[in-house]
A protein has these predicted regions:
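Methionine residue identity
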Residues: 1-3
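Low-complexity, intrinsically disordered or signal/transmembrane-proximal segments
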Residues: 12, 16, 29-30
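Conserved short alpha-helical segments that host acidic/polar catalytic motifs at enzyme active sites
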Residues: 22-229
Length: 229
């Protein structure tokens, strides 16, 4: 079974599909848990690319609608050209954000996250999105799902320079992307390379100064929907 690639949205709103993802060798039952007959995914991820629109506000309402999926923490990262502004904290969406905070987050691309902890403790250091720097600039990642090879992935990305600030597998995926970019790959190639190291069920959104990436695991276990504004 061939995994689906990320859907890549550039700043002109053009979609592009890619090939070549590695599927997990684990049975589907191991990816979805002991009760594959019921929905067990947690966390909410949201992303929006909209020129000349208040994307922070759009992300806020998107997270508000997804809040049933996670109520421990909330966060939004907004890109304004080559700059990224991140705000995240413990609590409900309405407790973490108000109009004053949102007004300080101009831009045309935003990703957001509601957290329900499945790996890592319920602390602010584990709130998302995760933001890291690369040679191509900053990127932000929001993740729903679980990796069944998190221990192996941590060993793979622990190159002696990675400064881990959380206990989540989401940060491990982000470091895998960062290191792939810093090896000389562009964003789509780096994401493909990083996901070859990941086994599990997941949906991801990744924001960069060059575009928005939406990724779903090859089995389609974790929900992810996209559309046009």
């Amino acid at each position: 079974m061939r995994m689906r690639c990320p859907v890549v949205w550039g700043r002109q709103g053009v979609g592009q599909n890619c090939e070549g993802f590695l599927k997990s060798r684990r049975p589907v039952q191991q990816l979805v848990g002991e009760r594959p007959d019921r929905m067990e995914e947690a966390c909410g991820v949201f992303a929006v690319l909209a020129v000349e629109q208040p994307v922070a506000n759009l992300a806020y309402f998107g997270l508000y609608a997804l809040q049933h999926r996670g109520q421990e923490s909330a966060g939004i990262a907004v890109f304004n050209q080559d700059k990224v502004r991140l705000h995240k904290d413990m609590g409900l969406v309405s407790q973490v954000f108000d109009q004053e905070v949102l007004a300080r987050m101009p831009g045309d691309l935003a990703i957001g996250h509601n957290r329900y902890s499945t790996t890592g403790s319920s602390r602010v250091c584990n709130a998302q999105p995760v933001v890291l720097m690369t040679r191509l600039g900053a990127f932000a990642l929001a993740h729903n799902g679980n990796l069944v090879n998190a221990a192996e992935l941590r060993q793979a990305v622990d190159d002696g320079q990675a400064e881990f600030t959380s206990t989540t597998d989401s940060e491990l995926i982000a470091f895998a992307v960062q290191q792939a970019v810093d090896r000389g790959l562009d964003w789509p190639e780096a994401i493909r390379s990083a996901l070859k190291l990941c086994q599990g069920a997941f949906s991801l959104v990744i924001g960069t100064s060059q575009g928005l990436f939406a990724i779903r695991d090859g089995y389609g276990i974790r929900p992810l929907v996209f559309g046009h504004l």
